[in-house]
Amino acid sequence: MLDWLKVNLQYVTPKHLLSRLVGKLAEAEMGSVTTFFIKLFIKQYNVDMTEALHEKPEHYRSFNKFFTRTLKPEARTIDESDDVLIHAVDGTVSQFGDIRSDSIFQAKGHDFSLTTLLGGKPDVAAPFKNGKFATVYLAPRDYHRIHMPIEGTLTDMLYVPGELFSVNPLTAQNIPGLFARNERVVALFDTPVGKMAMVLVGATIVASIETVWAGTVTPPTGKTVQHWSYETDSEAAVKLEKGAELGRFKLGSTIVVCFEKDMIDFEDIAPGMVTRLGEPMASKMSSQKAITPEQTTETPVQASNEFDDNAGETKKDTPSEGADS
């Protein structure tokens, strides 16, 4: 009965209004009041602050600065093996596996449309049909920056307006098409394993989603899908190395990553498994592997310089290369 109530209350809650109000409070710099709420959050969710570059709650001028905190360089290491794709986030695997034509598995009894997930654009979805996907949930205690599973060059970004349902496991099991209904940002990359789509899914009280190349992408400016294309062969091209920061959530959410058919094989992962940034997620299929001998090395995770963690400011560039609304 309680679970039913938790799910169905979301249909009548003013989720966008609530999220924007919480977002404003999370950005506010309120001194000791901010510190009090950060300490309360750390205790409630058992956040491991020994991994944070700045361990003391008093360091963070706003709640969002705490929530998007930088980790110590040695806290995570990137598997640099040529044939390995890494986990992009700290989180929990919700689902993973094959994309069946245009259908992605969400939970028992629920699938959602690949095309709808990617903004309702068949040409964007086409490369990923019958490919692979992985959905990873970021809990409140997790590190909330998103990194690249493999090196890639940004080709397109879409902002897709939508609902802001919670994305926790209970909601995923009960709300049809959840990840294709919620507000989201889609980033498309050319990579050594073909096209890759990184979908950053918003949720209740997720005040905004940011990327390292465009700054804040949400809150939105309208109710239509917006599409930006990017140069790939000029000095202005956005090229990100494996393990480089891609973006961040201000309050937690979910990512869905999609790959083309016959390009990758998932490693030993399963629904419910806890993921750590930098650890192996998948490998290139045999036909995609380099002929040169494999070399396995590890390097510390480096946060992007696009964000100023001390000043409390983020890059304010607007998405470029021709918005298509």
Curated annotation (Swiss-Prot):
<dbReference type="InterPro" id="IPR033178">
    <property type="entry name" value="PSD_type1_pro"/>
</dbReference>
<dbReference type="GO" id="GO:0004609">
    <property type="term" value="F:phosphatidylserine decarboxylase activity"/>
</dbReference>
<comment type="function">
    <text>Catalyzes the formation of phosphatidylethanolamine (PtdEtn) from phosphatidylserine (PtdSer).</text>
</comment>
<dbReference type="Pfam" id="PF02666">
    <property type="entry name" value="PS_Dcarbxylase"/>
</dbReference>
<feature type="compositionally biased region" description="Polar residues">
    <location>
        <begin position="284"/>
        <end position="305"/>
    </location>
</feature>
<comment type="pathway">
    <text>Phospholipid metabolism; phosphatidylethanolamine biosynthesis; phosphatidylethanolamine from CDP-diacylglycerol: step 2/2.</text>
</comment>
<feature type="region of interest" description="Disordered">
    <location>
        <begin position="281"/>
        <end position="325"/>
    </location>
</feature>
<feature type="active site" description="Charge relay system; for autoendoproteolytic cleavage activity">
    <location>
        <position position="90"/>
    </location>
</feature>
<dbReference type="GO" id="GO:0006646">
    <property type="term" value="P:phosphatidylethanolamine biosynthetic process"/>
</dbReference>
<dbReference type="InterPro" id="IPR033177">
    <property type="entry name" value="PSD-B"/>
</dbReference>
<protein>
    <recommendedName>
        <fullName>Phosphatidylserine decarboxylase proenzyme</fullName>
        <ecNumber>4.1.1.65</ecNumber>
    </recommendedName>
</protein>
<keyword id="KW-0456">Lyase</keyword>
<comment type="similarity">
    <text>Belongs to the phosphatidylserine decarboxylase family. PSD-B subfamily. Prokaryotic type I sub-subfamily.</text>
</comment>
<keyword id="KW-1003">Cell membrane</keyword>
<keyword id="KW-0472">Membrane</keyword>
<keyword id="KW-1208">Phospholipid metabolism</keyword>
<keyword id="KW-0443">Lipid metabolism</keyword>
<comment type="subunit">
    <text>Heterodimer of a large membrane-associated beta subunit and a small pyruvoyl-containing alpha subunit.</text>
</comment>
<feature type="active site" description="Schiff-base intermediate with substrate; via pyruvic acid; for decarboxylase activity">
    <location>
        <position position="253"/>
    </location>
</feature>
<feature type="active site" description="Charge relay system; for autoendoproteolytic cleavage activity">
    <location>
        <position position="147"/>
    </location>
</feature>
<feature type="site" description="Cleavage (non-hydrolytic); by autocatalysis">
    <location>
        <begin position="252"/>
        <end position="253"/>
    </location>
</feature>
<keyword id="KW-0865">Zymogen</keyword>
<feature type="modified residue" description="Pyruvic acid (Ser); by autocatalysis">
    <location>
        <position position="253"/>
    </location>
</feature>
<keyword id="KW-0670">Pyruvate</keyword>
<keyword id="KW-0594">Phospholipid biosynthesis</keyword>
<dbReference type="GO" id="GO:0005886">
    <property type="term" value="C:plasma membrane"/>
</dbReference>
<keyword id="KW-0210">Decarboxylase</keyword>
<keyword id="KW-0444">Lipid biosynthesis</keyword>
<dbReference type="InterPro" id="IPR003817">
    <property type="entry name" value="PS_Dcarbxylase"/>
</dbReference>
<feature type="active site" description="Charge relay system; for autoendoproteolytic cleavage activity">
    <location>
        <position position="253"/>
    </location>
</feature>
